[in-house]
């Protein structure tokens, strides 16, 4: 660890950024119900799409992705190494999943991973986004697409951005853990489509 003070500052800011849930503010603006109490109960873009359509969902997606990208940019501006930038990205994603401002009840982290990934390893993230899009187009199930991309992430990172393999392993594990209910629903054939 080359910059302990800067890393502590960056991860603290990243966690707090991650804790600002775009879904809540988008739902307030569009007068939609609380996403944690409606639809799937997840404050993420897919649930917002079901509750309010493509415009609120797109705003939620961009908000959540921007948090991940901003965390990495802050770390870079503080002169942190790529490894330390990855640690900062993880802090933002944990903030999104366990937000301090929302009783630690957050989202699944896919969009925040997308933003952080584009800022850190755009080649891997772009490839995984194409995988996600192909599965959504083929099956119309967002969670299945996210799980497929998460399972492929370590291999894709190893091929395209091997310096970030450990980060993508950790992020994949986070995504899989946060989707455990979806995995059960998929196994039972009960997962909702878009």
Curated annotation (Swiss-Prot):
The protein's name: Glycerol-3-phosphate acyltransferase
Coiled-coil annotated residue ranges, if any: none
GO CC annotations, alphabetized: plasma membrane
EC main group: transferase
Sequence intervals crossing the membrane: 7-27, 59-79, 86-106, 116-136, 157-177
Pathway field: Lipid metabolism; phospholipid metabolism
Record-level GO BP terms: phospholipid biosynthetic process
Protein's UniProt keywords contain Transcription regulation: no
Highest taxon listed in the record's lineage: Bacteria
Chief location category: membrane
EC assignment: 2.3.1.275
UniProt membrane topology term: Multi-pass membrane protein
């Amino acid at each position: 660890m080359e910059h302990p003070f800067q890393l502590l500052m960056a991860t603290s800011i990243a966690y707090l950024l991650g804790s600002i849930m775009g879904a809540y503010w988008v739902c307030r603006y569009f007068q939609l119900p609380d996403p944690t109490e409606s639809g799937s109960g997840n404050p993420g873009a897919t649930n917002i799409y079901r509750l309010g359509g493509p415009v609120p969902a797109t705003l939620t997606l961009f908000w959540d992705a921007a948090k991940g990208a901003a965390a990495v940019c802050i770390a870079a501006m503080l002169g942190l190494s790529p490894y330390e930038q990855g640690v900062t990205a993880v802090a933002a994603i944990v903030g999104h999943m366990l937000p301090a401002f929302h009783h630690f009840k957050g989202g699944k982290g896919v969009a925040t991973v997308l933003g952080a990934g584009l800022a850190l390893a755009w080649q891997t993230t772009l490839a995984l986004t194409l995988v996600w899009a192909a599965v959504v187009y083929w099956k119309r199930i967002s969670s299945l697409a996210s799980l497929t991309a998460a399972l492929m992430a370590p291999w894709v990172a190893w091929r395209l951005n091997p310096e970030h393999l450990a980060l993508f392993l950790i992020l994949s594990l986070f995504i899989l853990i946060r989707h455990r209910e979806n995995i059960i629903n998929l196994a039972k054939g009960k997962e909702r489509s878009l």
